[in-house]
């Protein structure tokens, strides 16, 4: 049914294939948006650089991309402090990419803005990867 929404979670090719078949898609490729992966594999800069609109789509196909989503398989990391560390600051990068126009893409400016959030993370005793800020 074309009423279904496809979650393109393996890589972009699955999302692209669904778009070409007429489905609406939420892009969530493991290459950029799996936050249980190490920072060595998926650094915050890579999350921030992610563009959910693959090259070569028609305007109509692009319009069926509903957004992006991060994934975190919690059976791998079950401790809250570890989960928080894996999420922050990557979830902030994902958020900015999700709500911003594609032209908003200066990672260094983003990093400066995110440093403001450090105070909140510390206040709420939330673990985060300070090396990524």
Q: PLM features: what roles do these ranges have?
A:
Residues 1-133:
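Flexible, acidic glycine-rich loops studded with aromatic residues
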């Amino acid at each position: 049914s074309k009423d279904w929404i496809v979650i393109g979670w393996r890589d972009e090719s699955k999302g692209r294939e669904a778009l070409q078949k007429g489905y609406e898609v939420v892009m969530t490729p493991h290459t950029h948006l799996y936050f249980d992966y190490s920072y060595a594999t998926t650094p915050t800069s890579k999350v921030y650089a992610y563009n959910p609109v693959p090259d070569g789509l028609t305007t109509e196909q692009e319009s069926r991309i509903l957004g992006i989503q991060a994934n975190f398989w919690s059976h791998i990391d079950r401790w809250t402090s570890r989960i928080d560390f894996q999420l922050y600051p990557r979830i902030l990068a994902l958020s900015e990419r999700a709500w911003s126009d594609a032209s908003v893409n200066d990672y260094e400016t983003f990093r400066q803005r995110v440093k403001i959030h450090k105070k909140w993370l510390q206040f709420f005793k939330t673990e985060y990867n300070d090396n990524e800020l």
